[in-house]
Amino acid sequence: MIHLEEIGELLEAADLQGPVAEELPRYLERIQDDPVLREDIEERSFSLLYSNILSPPSDWINSEDFLGDEGYLHNLLSVLNTLPIAFETHNRLNVPSGITRETFADIGRWTEYFQKEKGKYGLSTRITWWFTRHIQARLFSLGRLQFFIRPFPGTVLVLVNRAGETRLVARDGMACGPDGLLSENNPVFRTKYETGGEGFRGHPVLDGFVQAEKKFYPRFQWRLAVGKAFPLLDIHIPSGSSLSFESCADSIRRAYDFFPDHFYDYPFRGFMCESWFLDPRYKEVLSPESNILKFAAKLNLYPHGQNSNEGFWRVFGEGAESLAQAPRKTRMQKAVAAYLESGGKLTAGGGIVLNTEKPWGVSPPQDLLL
């Protein structure tokens, strides 16, 4: 358990500033003589350091449920308590100190977001578990983008031909609605995927939508480039500056420099991203000049998830509980509100781009080409 004399250094490492940087040491001092709460922090920190799941287990008790608002500080302290071990892991991997600072500054970014949205100091349990990726040295901030070491979950299969063209094919058993998006409640068709000596047969995925008609891809022309558990880097986009082409290209370039040096045994085949803003229907909603659409255009899109509450609170803020309460201050808020009022729905989406496609115009190292 961290001591009071260590807290200042950890606050700086997590880029925690303002009132929360004053409240957290006070909370730590208050629990010095409370063995139950100190032990609870140790247990939570242990789970963040060593659990192989990326969200709270079903039997997890939220700190805020039994501590009230102090539970958010309790969560934040549980994260900071892991940092000495997390820093040791970075040192063992020879991660440059600048990248370590960039990566763990995300704690301050999320704490600031939570204070802005909820008016509370600390972190919710949901946000706390996001940091398992940072703490376990699986996510790194490299400029505008973050990259998470994540084998592909296998929502689709990626085929390439001799000319370097890429095609996405839906995995077997996906329940799809009439629009080609996922729909477990009212499916119109379920995908079939077959492979054999002659080739691959399945439902193409075009611009994020699963096609109802199957197609055959002969093996002498096409091969499997990415399937379930194939090594990829998962892109996350933290809040911050503009999502420009140049900033994305710079981050991709840095990823090509960093990961082969520090994770040489993870020969990733490309990049993926699964997010609320990759909803393929945003083409109907947003301006063609939107950076979100420009980002999505660099990926081969596929459906991911169904109706997305995350998309709603990401656009309108966590305080908006209904469309009637939703603010309409930004162009995106106005456009999405009008879309929802006309009967539209929000979902999530995914996208993938192979190294051979030169993401954002950046050529990969030769060792990472298929």
Regions found by a protein language model. Give the residues of each.
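Non-catalytic substrate-recognition and accessory regions of acyl/acetyltransferase enzymes
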Residues: 1-243, 263-270, 286-370
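General N-terminal targeting signals
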Residues: 250-254, 285-290
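Short acidic, S/G/P-rich loop/turn micro-motifs used as interaction or catalytic elements
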Residues: 239-246, 277-281
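Conserved acetyl-CoA-binding loop-helix of GNAT-fold acetyltransferases
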Residues: 243-260
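Extended, charge-biased low-complexity segments
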Residues: 270-272, 279, 284
